[in-house]
């Protein structure tokens, strides 16, 4: 490897020494001020930047989760961002207790455009920045230290002046010496002090000083040392909210944020599931739930992390990896037999604390919530974030999952979702346990068809008619001719898309369907191409997968819902399959 091409941090920037550091002895006992930057810092890093509709979905999610400061865009950089800021202001989408944040470079015409975008908003943080690092000064801007500082102070003066023309808004200020980690700390202090002097904050109306690891360049302990040094040495510290903005270039963004917070910071900016340029911004999900595992209230609502993940995946058009902390498909799944045994014993011990002598299957989760969580291999109760135990406690029946998935994909063209692979391999295992021997490819297909495709009771689809409304929300109306328990029925429903409309129609039959996960793909190609659809649904309280295969994605999806309904309502089958997903 060409190791000589790379300089250590102490040579490239400086050697930060803080022999009397205090942060290692600190503990995190309360949540920081949070600022979600998904709509700007996250959005700019997407292959397919968010449409206005996806931005609205993300904004609504962040508000629902409890974020009080939300960066909504860079309105001077694009018309799309400008229009979105205007929309949420003019449509009164911003709650009174939420402050929107807008990003702007320290350039006059951009600053003026930013104020135009924010006119009429109640609470706004104007976040202005310029790069101060050695590399950017020398290579990008070709400015000396005084010129870079003047750029920052001139912007501060202009912002204060323009704000007087918009007296109806509660303005707050945030300044970032961008590329802070590549900047000498004494020079960063010099620039920040100069900006603070211009803005003239008070303890009652403080300025936010954001110290971003725009590029993560060194170990988290050095970042923490630099934050503690700034915390101690900045002028007018009592009038400053010290903010962190870590990136994850070295894979230690979460650690840098936690140690930086211990070192004296008050506030953290980041993105849900760590979206952002290159390796991403710090993950606010991981940070917040790390605090929860230590008994610290993160002041954010993660009680339905599956919904949060689905929304983020939809808005970002990026998949959350299976191993992503707290939110990935597999983070609460143990494939090792010894791990599984320990988890089972831990759940039983938890139940026995509530009801002596009882096992975990004999105590309701609501009762378990009254006791402290102590289960091996699970740092958090999955149900506290809206996950469940099924995948955790059934691992021993799931051996062979990979082989089953491979045959179904290569021989039969079905790319089952991962958690469905687990479910179907358990179905196959039931057959092999009962009959012995191996299951070949044809036998496996027959098991699959019997399990998912051939069920016509208690609900059989006869005909479906779907009408899509030409609206922004993709509303759909469905009329379904069914045979239910041997009787012909015609039901209608409306919803945001065909699946939601069909679920709405089934309500009239006292069948409650909530779609939890959905995926689809082409199974074959050519004139007679088929689509396969998979639906994980909660049907009258039972969580089951359904599968549909048809000539169109829409009808395959609707057949998948019917498949899930029939599996859920077939109690004898549920006993055979021992609990579903």
Curated annotation (Swiss-Prot):
One of its GO terms (biological process) is L-leucine biosynthetic process. Residues 455-581 are annotated as: Regulatory domain. Transmembrane segments: none annotated. Residues 32-306 form the Pyruvate carboxyltransferase domain. The keyword Coiled coil does not apply. It catalyses: 3-methyl-2-oxobutanoate + acetyl-CoA + H2O = (2S)-2-isopropylmalate + CoA + H(+). Its cofactor is Mg(2+). One of its GO terms (cellular component) is cytoplasm. It is found in: Cytoplasm. NCBIfam families: leuA_yeast, PRK03739.1. This is 2-isopropylmalate synthase. The gene is leuA.
